[in-house]
């Protein structure tokens, strides 16, 4: 039986070990400590019936956007996968970000090649692709930047903004295309006022 509970300072070493075992993106201990001290309510661990940490989610609030939560890292030991643990961890983090920090949304990054993780985020947790960030990872692999809106009204507003941005972009491109067409030099013609111009042949 696996239970989900808030992260405690004594869990940080186990979280780091799970990270090193499961993921290519690794962090020094001071990074986990920084998360725990700065956002103590947003990170959770999965614990088995023997008290062992078998998974974790490390979450925070974006320093530049105080209404935007972010999932820094999610890991579940291979022996404990396919049991819904990752989904439970993510749901707990989403609730904490909304209730504690009143976050509008939560974002994350996932490797384009990580189909299992993408399927979890997109199909199960309903995250949407926001953009593709080129060479995001240290090995130059691209990342999907994904977002889940925690408030329906905020999602609707963002969708309206995106549609307006698309309309404005299309209008701008149309205006620029018209300008280029007007600026193109017209072909020189030897017909003047409907009459063929006589061109003197030089012998």
Curated annotation (Swiss-Prot):
Annotated transmembrane regions: none
Query: Basic and acidic residues: which segments have biased composition?
Result: 177-186
Using the record's annotation, list all stretches that form the N-acetyltransferase domain: 2-151
Cytoplasm as a keyword of this entry, yes or no, is no
Q: Where does the record place the region Disordered? A: 177-203
Gene3D superfamilies assigned: 3.40.630.30
**CC annotations in GO:** NatA complex
By sequence similarity, the record places it as follows:
Belongs to the acetyltransferase family. ARD1 subfamily.
Protein name as catalogued: N-terminal acetyltransferase complex ARD1 subunit homolog
What organism does the record attribute this protein to?
Answer: Dictyostelium discoideum (Social amoeba)
Q: What is the lineage of its organism?
A: Eukaryota, Amoebozoa, Evosea, Eumycetozoa, Dictyostelia
Gene it is expressed from: natA
